[in-house]
Amino acid sequence: MTAAPNDWDVVLRPHWTPLFAYAAAFLIAVAHVAGGLLLKVGSSGVVFQTADQVAMGALGLVLAGAVLLFARPRLRVGSAGLSVRNLLGDRIVGWSEVIGVSFPGGSRWARIDLADDEYIPVMAIQAVDKDRAVAAMDTVRSLLARYRPDLCAR
């Protein structure tokens, strides 16, 4: 049930978190690669091999890749419903399943409210983005009113 790129009315992404994720991933990768290259410099009593250097650099690249997962969050809204991509995985929630969208006080990100007190976190709309998060919630709520007018009548 993959929708074409033009089927989405709006695509929302966080603003600050990807920037911090890119910077942190870069620093982690550089530190581990540099540390790996410098393992054989000097004598500390431990004999490091080339495999240790390669492993140190590879570990840094793996950790940097894990940090880059924080740059993935995205919310797409369209006639098919809401497509939520957080750190791992992508889920399309049909309009028939949605009973609301909310941003509870004290939360780090928004959520899609489902039946039976269930919800899906939406990491694409984060509190750290402040005014952008407010604008994003306004956009999502206006699209909710368009596709689920029965919810707004309550």
Curated annotation (Swiss-Prot):
It comes from the Bacteria. The keyword Phosphoprotein does not apply. It is a multi-pass membrane protein. Keywords: Cell membrane, Membrane, Transmembrane, Transmembrane helix. It is found in: Cell membrane. The chain crosses the membrane at residues 19-39, 51-71. The keyword Cell membrane applies. Coiled coil: none annotated. This is Uncharacterized protein Rv1417. It comes from Mycobacterium tuberculosis (strain ATCC 25618 / H37Rv). The lineage of its organism: Bacteria, Bacillati, Actinomycetota, Actinomycetes, Mycobacteriales.
